[in-house]
């Protein structure tokens, strides 16, 4: 990390830091002085909210950060999912971004990958609303990359 990173948390808010879950009892500011892997509570996607292909991919990528002990398994599932999504989506911007996201995860930059996946949600919503991905395809993806259900 080239510089320190300072974040503010509200009372009762949780943060996931290097696999540990921390909850603060009052408003605080935390300054990270070195490299750290963290995820703010408001960016954590719950399993029941992983209802679309990209949200499922996000859930898998966040598990790489939240559960370091299972990172190898989550990364393998991420790779399988990326391949499937690259074969299903036809939208050029989505395909290019999925390739970039795959590279970010390969480089150990899962936090940045999560931000990039969130950025694709509006396009995915348009694709799903226009049924550019058929409901059957979406259901097949859901079955293949959602073993936590």
Curated annotation (Swiss-Prot):
GO terms for biological process: bacterial-type flagellum organization; mRNA catabolic process; negative regulation of bacterial-type flagellum assembly. Pfam families: FlbT. One of its GO terms (molecular function) is mRNA 5'-UTR binding. Coiled coil: none annotated. Keywords: Bacterial flagellum biogenesis, Repressor, RNA-binding. Belongs to the FlbT family. Has a post-transcriptional repressor function in flagellum biogenesis. Associates with the 5'-UTR of fljK mRNA and promotes its degradation. This is Probable flagellum biosynthesis repressor protein FlbT. It comes from Rhizobium meliloti (strain 1021).
């Amino acid at each position: 990390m080239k510089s320190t990173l300072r974040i503010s948390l509200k009372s009762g808010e949780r943060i996931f830091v290097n696999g540990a879950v921390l909850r603060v009892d009052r408003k605080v500011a935390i300054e990270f002085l070195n490299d750290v892997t963290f995820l703010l509570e408001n960016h954590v996607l719950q399993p029941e909210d992983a209802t679309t292909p990209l949200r499922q991919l996000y859930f898998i990528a966040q598990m790489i950060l939240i559960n370091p002990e299972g990172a190898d398994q989550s990364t393998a599932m991420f790779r399988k999912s990326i391949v499937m999504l690259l074969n299903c989506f036809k939208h050029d911007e989505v395909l290019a971004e999925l390739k970039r996201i795959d590279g970010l995860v390969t480089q150990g930059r899962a936090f940045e990958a999560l931000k990039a996946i969130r950025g694709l949600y509006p396009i995915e919503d348009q694709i799903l609303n226009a049924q550019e991905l058929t409901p059957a395809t979406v259901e097949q993806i859901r079955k293949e990359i959602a073993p936590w259900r």
